[in-house]
């Protein structure tokens, strides 16, 4: 995903009821580095919700992913590495589900000019791997949004607005209306505001 989309989102914020702090960090398409950084996010910040945003070059719509998979990682990353045995976390469940009901969010989200769909297969690559790790560390308090590449029909401004609406709905879904959000390139953390 292009960082300028998150710049757009940071300009928009998440609305008046939500205190928002935006930061970006691009996660490389690297299994080991993604694992290190995602683990650090959960250990260092203990967020209430992490929303990963990854680009799917074949996507024609924004895709809300319900689950992450533990096995099947056979494609090499940018460093020609893949997890041993194609497994993210040996001994962990095959599938972890998000605590956010993506189907419900998908039904409630309407952004003119952007299709939003629901999926249960995030693709067994670094995005899915990262998502599974977050679901594991956060005990289901994570989400993954796959976005299509930016284009004339989907400029950064429109994608930023769409992500804003989707994340607002996710916050409603988890029932925590007042949060401070920290947005990371390919990972968006939502943390409680101080004093909450």
Swiss-Prot record:
Pfam families: Peptidase_C15 (PF01470). GO terms for molecular function: cysteine-type peptidase activity. Keywords: Hydrolase, Protease, Thiol protease. GO terms for biological process: proteolysis. InterPro entries: Peptidase_C15-like, Peptidase_C15-like_sf. The active site is at residues 65, 127, 146. It is an enzyme of class 3 (hydrolase). Its EC number is 3.4.19.-. The keyword Protease applies. PANTHER family: PROTEASE FAMILY C15 PYROGLUTAMYL-PEPTIDASE I-RELATED, PYROGLUTAMYL-PEPTIDASE 1-LIKE PROTEIN. Belongs to the peptidase C15 family. This is Pyroglutamyl-peptidase 1-like protein.
């Amino acid at each position: 995903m292009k960082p300028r989309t998150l710049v757009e989102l940071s300009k928009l914020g998440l609305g008046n009821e939500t205190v928002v702090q935006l930061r970006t960090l691009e996660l490389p398409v690297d299994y080991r580095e993604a694992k290190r950084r995602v683990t650090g996010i959960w250990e260092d910040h203990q967020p209430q919700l992490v929303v990963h945003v990854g680009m799917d070059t074949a996507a024609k719509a924004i895709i809300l992913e319900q689950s992450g998979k533990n096995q099947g990682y056979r494609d090499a990353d940018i460093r020609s590495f893949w997890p041993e045995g194609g497994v993210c976390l040996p001994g962990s469940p095959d599938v972890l589900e998000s605590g956010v009901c993506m189907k419900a969010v998908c039904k409630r989200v309407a952004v003119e000019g952007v299709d939003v769909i629901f999926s249960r297969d995030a693709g067994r690559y670094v995005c899915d791997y990262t998502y599974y790790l977050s679901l594991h560390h956060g005990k289901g308090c994570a989400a993954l949004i796959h976005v299509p590449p930016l284009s004339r029909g989907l400029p950064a401004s429109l994608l930023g607005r769409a992500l804003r609406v989707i994340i607002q709905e996710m916050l409603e879904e988890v029932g925590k209306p007042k949060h401070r959000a920290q947005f990371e390139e390919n990972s968006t953390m939502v943390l409680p505001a101080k004093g909450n």
